[in-house]
């Protein structure tokens, strides 16, 4: 009796019809494809994109040259050089991030005690040669100045979870 059931299952292609039923269910479902450059998906305030250096409202840069971000970076993508100022505070003379090495883990952002280095929502940047993707202090400050309002909103939205 069991052999007869097995014969009819394989002869009538029951397994294949079950598979086609699943395929048919999704074949006519609405598509969820996002046509990328024209349409963009919503981003979280915690999105980790292009790095930026921030300034205080009075215009002074936030980085105190503690070098915690350089020490915590697993990819060793951050290079910092600093000097002592007349008022006995340290400030950076060089702050470079090699975006080719960076793995966008966010450790630098978490390690920073003064929220100087942050990752923005910017994900569209490019370089035509390798050196174009090494961001200097001036470039990072320019990114921070350009997106400061968005960065402040994202930091405020994320504050309860920090």
Swiss-Prot record:
Q: What class of enzyme is it?
A: translocase
- Please give the Gene3D superfamilies that the UniProt record associates with this protein: 3.30.70.3270
List ligand-binding residues for [4Fe-4S] cluster 2.
73, 102, 105, 108
Which residues of the sequence carry a binding annotation for [4Fe-4S] cluster 1? 63, 66, 69, 112
Q: Which reaction does it catalyse?
A: a quinone + NADH + 5 H(+)(in) = a quinol + NAD(+) + 4 H(+)(out)
Required cofactors, per record?
[4Fe-4S] cluster
Q: How is the cofactor bound?
A: Binds 2 [4Fe-4S] clusters per subunit.
Any idea where the 4Fe-4S ferredoxin-type domain is? 53-83, 93-122
Its family remark reads: Belongs to the complex I 23 kDa subunit family.
Quaternary structure and partners? NDH-1 is composed of 14 different subunits. Subunits NuoA, H, J, K, L, M, N constitute the membrane sector of the complex.
Q: What is this protein called?
A: NADH-quinone oxidoreductase subunit I
Q: Which gene encodes it?
A: nuoI
